Amino acid sequence: MSAESRKFEFSPENMERAKAHVAKYPEGRQASAVLALLDLAQRQNGGWVSRQAMTHIAGLLGMAEIRAYEVATFYTMVNLEPVGKYLIQLCRTTTCWLCGSDELRDVCADVLGIGVGESTADGMFTLIEVECLGACVNAPMAQINDDFYEDLSAARLKEILAMLRRGEQPPTGSQSGRQTSAPASGATTLLDSGSA
């Protein structure tokens, strides 16, 4: 039986979560919870949403199946095909590209043996390119599952991939040690505490 043909239902725990999402909306507006339920289904289903999951969600929300499908196919964060345990999303927008995202893509090709849109044979990693992830000041960056890895170098990405393969959780955020989106060169203004 293919993954696509399996019936989908929320687990008891996720059904409770789904009900909590739906309860946030007024009567007659339950369909507004569709994106939250698609995310919940994706997390339960190993990182992707099947047509059966969309049908299940549409039934729960009392909406036409096509409406759930429209939402799922509109948002790029909804994966419509199986992905690896670690979904690597490389930012390819101008800032990340200028700061070296091509080298990060090359690391994935060399270390994992996959190109963009491919998964490793063991199902561990999937690589995709995405548009702006919203951390341009910390370019180049990648999102792996729900975590941001910013200020990435090719060498650091190799280390992160090795850690993930060993089952370790690499530290998230800036990989160069800077705080949030502070200037890469350090503070340049308001250095004199007596000024103001």
What is each model feature region?
Residues 1-196:
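Signature of N-terminal electron-transfer/Fe-S-associated modules in redox systems
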